[in-house]
Curated annotation (Swiss-Prot):
Residues annotated for Zn(2+) 1 binding in this entry: 44, 67, 156
Protein name per its UniProtKB record: Alcohol dehydrogenase 3
Binding site for Zn(2+) 2: 100, 103, 106, 114
EC number: 1.1.1.1
Family: Belongs to the zinc-containing alcohol dehydrogenase family.
Species of provenance: Emericella nidulans (strain FGSC A4 / ATCC 38163 / CBS 112.46 / NRRL 194 / M139) (Aspergillus nidulans)
Cellular component per GO, a single term: cytoplasm
Key words, A-Z: Cytoplasm, Metal-binding, NAD, Oxidoreductase, Zinc
Catalytic activity field: a primary alcohol + NAD(+) = an aldehyde + NADH + H(+); a secondary alcohol + NAD(+) = a ketone + NADH + H(+)
Length: 352
């Protein structure tokens, strides 16, 4: 396949400034890398943080964001075997762009925790461009029966919430409270939870998000902006008023992280996934100990988690709710995201 020398991309020139739609050189893959012609890229709240530069994690600048890219392999390095990727294969570029594959973390299938990991759209350029590079070992193969536009959100949001649900330890028939249920991660978390046999309580705000959550199978929707007592409402929605077996925190504000231990049941798990800037997670030591509450973080997923998350979609168990928009509209999408006005996920159409 012929590859041009230049391409269109959304480039953040300086942290805190909106991306600029401009032409940049097309990167060339290294020996162990693939070059993917992007068809679609999801827009994640992480991309907004990368633009703002408000995380305690240095990013490259200028930066091409994005880490939910789905497309077709158009070039590859000499070390990439055909059984891994051939020219023309469908491929996904995820948040974890590459890792060393030889440290203790990588050896025990915790590649996201690799101290040498490269992160798409953060420490290396990501998927808000026509052509993106990724390490072949970490890229995802997208099944032929999964549409590329629908696959894009699965590559980060889907994998992340699927991993978080596994980390929660919740078993079929048990109840999971999903905080931020109406967003891109939350809309997928509800579906993965249902497919895993879990019952869900959706916590978010707004009529549009309520309608979407109910359509996705939430047994109860709690609007935190209208509720006089979120803790009491969650408990009231569970058998015996004992609280949720697990809480999945996808929120981008600090308060839900302080509140979750109040409505998780004894011996339950609070799983922190959302990353509000400059926030802290606090809980009373006495209550946490005597109620045996498990508080943990869950960070994206490893290669096998990615395979499993895509397989759920391929088997028709997940329907990613998303809206399409052209790559040129990214700044406006960031504005809506910052205002909390997006239900589901936006997927960018990358120009040919």
């Amino acid at each position: 396949m012929s590859v041009p020398e230049v391409q269109w991309a959304q480039v953040v020139e300086k942290a805190g400034t909106p991306p600029v739609y401009k032409q940049v050189p097309v990167p060339k893959p290294g020996p162990d890398e693939i070059l993917v012609k992007m068809r679609y890229s999801g827009v994640c709240h992480t991309d907004l943080h990368a633009m703002k530069g408000d995380w305690p994690l240095p990013s490259k600048m200028p930066l091409i964001g994005g880490h939910e890219g789905a497309g077709v392999v158009v070039a590859k390095g000499e070390l990439v075997k055909d059984e891994d990727f051939k020219i023309g294969d469908r491929a996904g570029i995820k948040w974890l762009n590459g890792s060393c594959l030889s440290c203790e973390m990588c050896m025990q299938a915790d590649e996201p925790l690799c101290p040498h990991a490269s992160l798409s759209g953060y420490t290396v350029d990501g998927t808000f461009q026509q052509y993106t590079i990724g390490k072949a070992a970490l890229a995802s193969k997208i099944p032929d029966n999964v549409p590329l536009d629908a696959a894009a959100p699965i590559l980060c949001a889907g994998i992340t919430v699927y991993k978080g649900l596994k980390e929660s330890g919740a078993r079929p028939g048990q109840t999971v409270a999903i905080v931020g249920a109406g967003g891109g991660l939350g809309s997928l978390a509800q579906q993965y939870a249902k497919a895993m046999g879990l019952r869900t309580i959706a916590i978010d705000s707004g009529d549009e998000k309520k309608a979407m959550c109910e359509q996705l199978g939430a047994e109860v929707f709690i609007d935190f902006s209208k509720s006089a007592d979120v803790v009491a409402d969650v408990k009231a929605a569970t058998p015996g008023g004992l609280g949720a077996h697990a809480v999945i925190l996808l929120a981008v504000a600090e308060k839900p992280f302080q509140q979750a231990t109040e409505y998780v049941r004894s011996h339950g798990s609070v799983v922190a996934i959302g990353l509000p800037a400059n926030a802290f997670l606090k809980a009373p030591v006495f209550t946490t100990v005597v109620r045996m509450i498990n508080i943990k973080g869950s960070y994206v997923g490893n290669r096998q988690d990615g395979v499993e998350a895509l397989d759920f979609f391929a088997r028709g168990l997940i329907k990613a709710p998303f809206k399409k928009a052209p790559l040129q509209d990214l700044p406006q999408i960031f504005e809506l995201m910052g205002q909390g006005k997006i239900a589901g996920r936006y997927v960018l159409e990358i120009p040919e």
